[in-house]
């Protein structure tokens, strides 16, 4: 849960009672993250059932990425061979394709042979011993410079025992990671057709291996235009912003991420002034998308903020933060007697409800009341006061702390 993607479906695989790979004990000592201890599978649905459900729900064919044994997919295809029609291709990391060998194959060789013979297209990605992609301190430094939570976690883990020692000894290489490189830069790989539906690929030469290190960092950095339609990236240069906004830019982006900054800027331009509840709506919308780990335009929203300012101003932030706009028909304003800073978010039949915690709502009311006492209601000095409050809340309010979350509600 350390990345706040709690809504991403997780399933527990079937035990095959195979011997653990040689590195299992060592890997168990690595600090992978907050949820690393939840390895028993208790409370999770069966992986095969989750895969089958997901394949059935997707509108387009799926690229199925496998970084371990093929047991779960084998169970799905054996139960319902037609499920393979929903898969565009399988991209599987395995140590060797010719002949088949390595932990991912040997853990469940029956499953691997079945899937490879199923007729579903399979690309087997393997490391090339002649040109390994070594995880060096310089590569970890490059990863650490990428400004997102994933890169920071990777860098911190590899700078901490026991991985730090292995990095220093140049023992670690990119193995499973090569699947991501292949998906984003297939031109770096040489490909051999093994039969009509199965092919093997590995990095073609040392030049490709060197380029793979650069591509790994680029993959973590992501596309600058992943959320924008007109911008390539989003401007954060101080020269483009009002003088009172400039001091918070770097800190707000570092603390809350570029996605929240982008949505906050666009919302307040749309809203007509730098508003408190508009900014709360942004944070709420981004948090909901983060929970499901989805992009914009993918979520249904019901807001309980009503139609009357100031609370209804939250609706503008919700639209921009989620992409669930009135024009797309993805947001509904509930007709209620007492508006409140609360909204429901639904994605693929799963729903969460976010509510601004009372202590934050009370703080906003007290601060706004103080402004009215000092400057009068809706006067120009009052709006300047509200603007300063909104900037302070934008920077100080952490979207992971200010909302109560109710799942399936």
Cite the ranges covered by each PLM segment.
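Active-site nucleophilic cysteine motif
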Residues: 172-181, 273-283
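Non-transmembrane, aqueous-exposed alpha-helical and coiled segments at domain scale
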Residues: 222-274, 280-409
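Generic detection of long, well-ordered alpha-helical segments
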Residues: 206-210, 278, 308
């Amino acid at each position: 849960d350390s990345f706040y993607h709690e809504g991403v479906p997780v399933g527990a695989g079937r035990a095959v009672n195979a011997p653990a790979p040689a590195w299992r004990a060592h890997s168990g000592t690595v600090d992978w993250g907050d949820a690393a201890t939840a390895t028993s599978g208790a409370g999770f649905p069966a992986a095969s059932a989750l895969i089958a459900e997901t394949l059935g729900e997707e509108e387009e064919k799926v690229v199925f990425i496998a970084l371990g044994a093929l047991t779960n997919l084998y169970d799905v295809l054996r139960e319902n061979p037609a499920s393979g029609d929903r898969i565009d291709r399988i991209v599987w990391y395995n140590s060797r394709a010719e002949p088949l060998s390595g932990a991912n194959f040997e853990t469940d060789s029956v499953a691997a042979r079945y899937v490879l013979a199923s007729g579903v297209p399979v690309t087997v990605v393997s490391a090339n011993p002649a040109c390994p992609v070594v995880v060096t301190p310089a590569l970890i430094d490059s990863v650490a410079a990428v400004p997102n939570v994933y890169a920071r976690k990777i860098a911190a883990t590899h700078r901490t025992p026991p991985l730090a020692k292995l990095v220093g000894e140049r023992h670690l290489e990119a193995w499973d990671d090569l699947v991501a490189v292949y998906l984003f830069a297939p031109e770096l790989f040489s490909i051999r057709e093994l039969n009509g539906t199965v092919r093997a690929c590995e990095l073609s030469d040392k030049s490709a291996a060197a380029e793979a290190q650069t591509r790994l960092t680029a993959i973590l950095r992501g596309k600058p235009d992943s959320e924008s339609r007109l911008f390539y990236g989003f401007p954060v240069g101080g020269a483009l912003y009002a003088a009172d906004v400039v001091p918070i830019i770097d800190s707000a982006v570092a603390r809350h991420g570029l996605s929240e900054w982008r949505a906050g800027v666009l919302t307040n331009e749309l809203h007509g002034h730098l508003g408190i509840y508009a900014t709360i709506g942004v944070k709420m919308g981004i948090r909901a998308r983060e929970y499901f780990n989805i992009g914009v335009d993918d979520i249904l929203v019901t807001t309980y903020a009503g139609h009357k300012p100031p609370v209804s101003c939250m609706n503008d932030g919700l639209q921009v933060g989620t992409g669930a706009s009135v024009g797309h028909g993805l947001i509904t304003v509930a007709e209620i007697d007492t508006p409140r800073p609360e909204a429901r978010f639904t994605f693929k039949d799963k729903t969460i409800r976010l509510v601004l915690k009372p202590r934050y709502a009370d703080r906003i009311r007290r601060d706004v009341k103080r402004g009215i006492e000092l400057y009068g209601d809706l006067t120009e000095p009052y709006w300047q006061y509200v603007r300063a409050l909104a900037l302070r809340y934008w920077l100080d309010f952490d979207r992971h702390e200010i909302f109560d979350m109710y799942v399936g509600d």
